[in-house]
């Protein structure tokens, strides 16, 4: 696999068996939005491709469970820190499951690594990289000769992204430990960690050595990732990561989507209208480094492309596909899966990979038209679809449930009742009643398919 490093601006080859990946996760004070979803889905694809390659992947995604935003939520709601963070961690993980994001090997929470954070600050203090102000302990960026080497930023152009609530030695200096009588004891005084320190301590505790890949949204490159790299370089005496990957912004109407800009589109909002697999397909449909402009029409088109995958599955009578063995050794045998894997190994070239998937589906349908009774052909296509599902992370659902998605239990019972009435009417040659029932269901966007095994129904989503 070759990946474009955000720092070197060139593709770097991953030529080792064991791969370590750390993805910056959410600050858990609210439901996750599509920006969080895209980051998780993009780097879940990376993980799946590596696993399909036969790599052993050690994957961590953290939770920031102590932060100014969480404290503000505490003040507004009257809830404890634990009540808020537990609720939103559970909410986030529910969203990830619906999006078919594989569970990380490690899900560190910042509050579980306070001792490690204090140890890191002590190392930095010992070597003269810190100073004290009235509100906390700060990192002196002027003492780090390589500061800004990660983001290659001109500091003057990025002052607006920095915190300037106190008079620091340098505008780029950042807090390591915030004094706060409500939190943790330390030799520096009671307080809580700064955000940039949290990730470094968790990475050092879990991986111990330089990461192969550090991933996150492009908005984290500066100052968050720059400040992480500085602390690791100065405190741990090593490079934090060999490869840095950053996914592009999710935008709405051309504007970056974020909670701070009050234009978030929550994952749960999208999931009210579209199934998780359709949303996953959509979020994957442009290259991870590209900025992603959300549009309802594009999401609907992504759903139509995914429908074709499921139509082929249905034609083959291929039911639910298990995602269980993705985390274990999986062997890619089909030629199409090997070709798509080769494409994705070039910096996750998803557009080319999905185009090839579309071509494969069209070709498979043509072959089945010509050789509808060829059992070997059918089995080969089934195996290919199963392998492709595990690589892309979509296509696992039972086809009947897929095409009936979005129908409530009560609606389902009513539909089944009407189908039985229609069947009875047809038996009695009461075709006017049978046609009226079909029309009634059609008006509710339900289409009926009469088969030798009975009538089945689908929800029309377009």
Swiss-Prot record:
Motif ('HIGH' region): 26-36
Binding residues annotated for ATP, in chain numbering: 259
Chief location: cytoplasm
UniProt-listed Enzyme Commission number(s): 6.1.1.16
Superkingdom as given in the UniProt entry: Bacteria
Catalytic activity: tRNA(Cys) + L-cysteine + ATP = L-cysteinyl-tRNA(Cys) + AMP + diphosphate
Cofactor note: Binds 1 zinc ion per subunit.
Keyword 4Fe-4S: no
Top class in the EC scheme: ligase
Cross-referenced Gene3D superfamilies: Cysteine-tRNA ligase, C-terminal anti-codon recognition domain (1.20.120.1910), HUPs (3.40.50.620)
A GO MF label: cysteine-tRNA ligase activity
CDD domains noted in UniProt: CysRS_core (cd00672)
SMART domains documented for this protein: DALR_2
GO BP of this protein: cysteinyl-tRNA aminoacylation
Motif ('KMSKS' region): 256-260
Residues holding Zn(2+): 24, 199, 224, 228
InterPro entries, per database record: Cys-tRNA-ligase (IPR015803), Cys-tRNA-synt_Ia_DALR (IPR015273), Cys-tRNA/MSH_ligase (IPR024909), Rossmann-like_a/b/a_fold (IPR014729), tRNA-synt_1_cat_dom (IPR032678), tRNAsynth_Ia_anticodon-bd (IPR009080)
Family assignment from sequence similarity: Belongs to the class-I aminoacyl-tRNA synthetase family.
HAMAP family: Cys_tRNA_synth
NCBIfam families: cysS
Protein name in UniProt: Cysteine--tRNA ligase
Source organism of the structure: Campylobacter jejuni subsp. jejuni serotype O:6 (strain 81116 / NCTC 11828)
